[in-house]
Design a protein with these regions (language model features):
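Domain-level recognition of nuclease-like catalytic cores that cleave nucleotide substrates
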Residues: 549-578
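Sensor-1/coupling segment of RecA-like P-loop NTPase cores
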Residues: 195-217
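Accessory nucleic acid-recognition modules appended to NTPase machines
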Residues: 293-501
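Conserved lysine of the Walker
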Residues: 126
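A short, basic N-terminal segment
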Residues: 33, 46-111
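Conserved catalytic cores of phosphodiester-cleaving nucleases, focusing on short active-site segments
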Residues: 482, 501-526
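Interdomain motor-coupling "hinge/lid" segment immediately C-terminal to the ATP-binding subdomain
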Residues: 215-360
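Hydrophobic positions on the alpha1 helix immediately C-terminal to the Walker A/P-loop
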Residues: 129, 133
């Protein structure tokens, strides 16, 4: 018996559906009831997909090798029917990211003539989101769904050809993955919205060159696209989706949805090793920027970065910025001889450690440390640069890193000089920062001074350095996630001539604020809240920002209250932001 198909007849002005098929050499037909039409259409489409698979089956080394469709039909890799089931099955047990709801609403919502752009840096869960959505589809929807995989060998004309074929066959839901690999995507992206979305297709575009999507929105898509970001991964998602609990684990590995958590599998995290972090910076960030600039305006928009790109020094500049991301993004960061800001801070803190003061780091050969860091991070110092790094380079690199959602500025307000504009640049991927810190520790361990002191003292010094780094990073994480979760508030650090409030949450409309100290400690001690209880600081703050509604210490211990100070557990605080 043949698969058959649906035809329609008009009788007395009314349209009726009929199922026609061939059986024993004879054509047969029957009327299809309205309530069974959708299910029957799905069964027919599924049977057709299976038939195509059988026709395209080849034998190689005794094993069956399947292609999604005959090579003569599609020019890209198109998956439909049974292949979609195989494609989505491996992620059925995975927990979903919060942005899954927006993807679901677009696919199943009313047609609005727009495409959805799912973009973000590598390993932030874009393809997994698509596979999860396809995996939850019923048979009727899946029969009208196709997943299109493209690469650098394909062109926009190839994708256009395949989308027309899919449209003619009744496919409605099309996911195009790695679409930014198309060299002509940025200049021709309007094809997806102006031709296919307006025709009733739901088009989801995804890719790792997120900068390319930003360019295409400006050049081609305008208001005909919905942008769905995946790069920013807050702690609450890291814990819930990956099943990895604890702020220190987030500091070490946060920033990607690499399948390293208990809810995924036991593969290594992206930032578990220095090499992994370096590879990520090179492929997900530097090459992202390079590829997008190469394709944007036919390579005519490199601006001041042209020389850096041509001489292979863009990765060098980005690495330098990431290493010193906690400090002002100034020309000095890019042009000075490489030196570790983390080491300078740790030297000072170790000298004034109340329990175990030591000047061991004063004896460390700082040049040797810098050289080891240079070797590990593969960063050329200024003398090795074949092109001068100027202020224009700094500005443009910072712009692109912000477009990639990789960095975010947090205001730093000086109470003594309110007109002074300052900010701290926070990295959205803490694991990348921590990987560089571990490289610093390796450099210290190789210094001769450390070989001359006891292993107990040596380990204590190293532990203190890493604790200082984690403390600074925890502060940044709290600031960033609070800013992202509370866009109706102003989030900033407030500095005084002596001391500071680590975070102020200012409600300008209601003339009130909250003040915070952020400590990496797991113990509540009086010294943590001395600034919060400073009457002069609080009076100046209330004069400028209104009534103080709450005083808080965010730390790693249990939530509790001591007098007028609320102690908040950091993991609980970050999860409550959702």
């Amino acid at each position: 018996m043949s698969i058959g198909g649906i035809t329609y007849k008009k009788i007395n002005g009314k349209r009726y559906a009929y199922y026609q098929w061939c059986e024993d050499g004879k054509q047969r037909s029957r009327r299809v009831k309205d309530d069974e039409l959708e299910s029957l259409v799905a069964q027919i489409e599924l049977a057709k997909s299976q038939a195509v698979l059988e026709r395209s089956m080849e034998l190689s080394d005794g094993r069956a090798v399947y292609s999604a469709q005959p090579l003569s039909v599609f020019k890209t890799d198109v998956k439909t029917g049974v292949l979609l089931e195989n494609f989505s099955d491996p992620v059925k047990g995975f927990k979903k990211r919060e942005c899954f709801a927006a993807l679901h609403d677009y696919v199943y919502g009313a047609n609005n003539d727009r495409v959805l752009v799912l973009y973000g840096l590598r390993r932030t869960g874009k393809t997994t989101l698509v596979r999860q959505l396809i995996g939850e589809m019923d048979a009727a929807h899946r029969a009208k769904t196709a997943f299109v995989q493209v690469n650098t060998r394909h062109t926009l004309a190839d994708v256009n050809h395949d989308l027309k074929l899919l449209e003619s066959q009744g496919f409605k839901y099309v996911f195009v993955d790695e679409v930014t690999q198309l060299g002509d995507f940025i200049e021709g992206a309007a094809l997806f919205s102006d031709v296919f979305a307006v025709g009733g297709m739901k088009i989801v575009l995804s890719g790792t060159d997120s900068l390319g999507f930003v360019f295409s929105e400006d050049e081609q898509l305008y208001d005909r696209c919905i942008l769905l970001h995946t790069t920013f991964i807050p702690y609450r998602e890291f814990e819930r989706v990956l099943g990895v609990v604890g702020i220190d684990e987030f500091i070490r590995y946060g920033g990607t949805m690499s399948m390293g958590g208990t809810n995924y599998n036991k593969d290594a995290f992206t930032f578990a090793t220095k090499k992994g972090a370096d590879d990520y910076v090179d492929s997900a960030i530097a090459r992202n920027i390079q590829h997008s600039l190469k394709c944007y305006q036919y390579g005519g928009h490199f601006r001041s970065l042209q020389q850096l790109y041509e001489r292979g020094e863009l990765t060098n500049a980005i690495n330098r910025i990431v290493e010193d991301i906690n400090h002002r993004f100034t020309l000095d960061v890019l042009t000075r001889d490489f030196a570790s800001s983390d080491l300078k801070i740790s030297v000072s803190n170790l000298r004034r450690d109340r329990m175990h003061p030591t000047d061991a780091l004063d004896k460390v050969n700082a040049v040797a440390v810098a050289q080891e860091m240079k070797r590990l991070l593969e960063i050329m110092d200024r003398n090795e640069c074949s092109v001068d790094i100027e202020d224009a380079h700094r500005v443009e690199i910072r712009e692109y890193l912000q477009m990639l959602d990789m960095i975010c500025p947090i205001d730093v307000v000086n109470m003594a000089s309110l007109n002074q504009n300052a900010f701290r640049t926070v990295l959205a991927q803490p694991g990348l920062r921590y990987a560089q810190s571990e490289a610093l520790v390796r450099g210290l361990m190789m210094d001769e001074v450390f070989q001359k002191i006891s292993i107990g003292e040596r380990n204590r010094i190293i532990a203190r350095i890493l604790d200082e780094i984690r403390g600074r990073m925890m502060e940044e994480i709290v600031l960033l996630e609070t800013k992202m979760a509370r866009p109706d508030r102003q989030i900033f650090t407030l500095q005084f001539p002596v001391g500071e409030f680590d975070m102020v949450v200012f409600d300008s409309e209601n003339a009130c604020c909250e003040i915070y100290e952020i400590k990496h400690s797991d113990k509540a001690v009086p010294a943590q809240c001395r600034h919060l209880q400073d009457k002069k600081k609080c009076h100046e703050t209330e004069f400028r920002y209104g009534k103080i509604k709450g005083r808080y210490v965010i730390y790693r211990g249990k939530s509790c209250r001591q007098d007028d100070i609320e102690y908040l557990n950091v993991e609980e605080y970050l999860k409550d932001l959702g």
